[in-house]
């Protein structure tokens, strides 16, 4: 039994609760959880997931800073939709990162799932950036990442983590609806 994996999964549930509520407390938790998963993923040969956990840790610091930089007179950064002008650049970044990581994993590692690992990693980079900017569609990106990751983790015998990501996928649906509601409320106040 991997106690580190269990600890990471439990902290992940706490993270999810804070994210669902659009609470700034998701950010400190988002620094702790990936620190644990760097080790867990490396142990089972999910190298891109291990590296993406380093990114998550750094993105957690960035997201925390982004959410904190709004002054009390301006209020908290509101939830908003992703500007359409960002969709093409985000897609290009997704494709480039996906191909680069996939090639590296296929040629330089013993990964048994290089392209799946690469896909979830590339999309996670985009989703985490969207979360830092409080774009509601980040939930849709996470839904795809979580569903694919759930299957990968079952394949890799990471059952607690697979359960966590299955739960993430379900809650991503509810999170999207909740954030849409928050976005609509902030538009009504304007």
Predicted feature residues:
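Membrane-water interface of transmembrane alpha-helices
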Residues: 55-72
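Core catalytic region of metal-dependent phosphoesterases/phosphodiesterases
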Residues: 28-31
């Amino acid at each position: 039994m991997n106690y580190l994996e269990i600890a990471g999964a439990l902290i992940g549930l706490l993270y999810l609760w804070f994210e669902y509520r659009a609470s700034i407390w998701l950010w400190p938790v988002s620094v702790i959880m990936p620190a644990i998963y760097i080790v867990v993923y490396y142990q089972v040969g999910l190298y891109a997931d291990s590296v993406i956990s380093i990114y998550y840790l750094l993105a957690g610091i960035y997201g925390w800073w982004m959410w904190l930089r709004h002054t009390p007179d301006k209020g908290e950064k509101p939830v908003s939709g992703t500007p359409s002008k960002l969709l093409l650049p985000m897609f290009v970044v997704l494709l480039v990162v996906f191909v680069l990581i996939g090639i590296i994993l296929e040629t330089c590692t013993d990964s048994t799932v290089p392209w799946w690992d690469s896909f979830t990693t590339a999309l996670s980079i985009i989703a985490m950036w969207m979360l830092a900017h409080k774009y509601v569609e980040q939930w849709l990106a996470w839904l795809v990442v979580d569903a694919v990751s759930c299957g990968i983790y079952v394949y890799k015998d990471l059952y607690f983590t697979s359960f966590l990501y299955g739960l993430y996928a379900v809650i991503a649906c509810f999170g999207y609806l909740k954030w849409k509601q928050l976005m609509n409320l902030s538009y009504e106040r304007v």
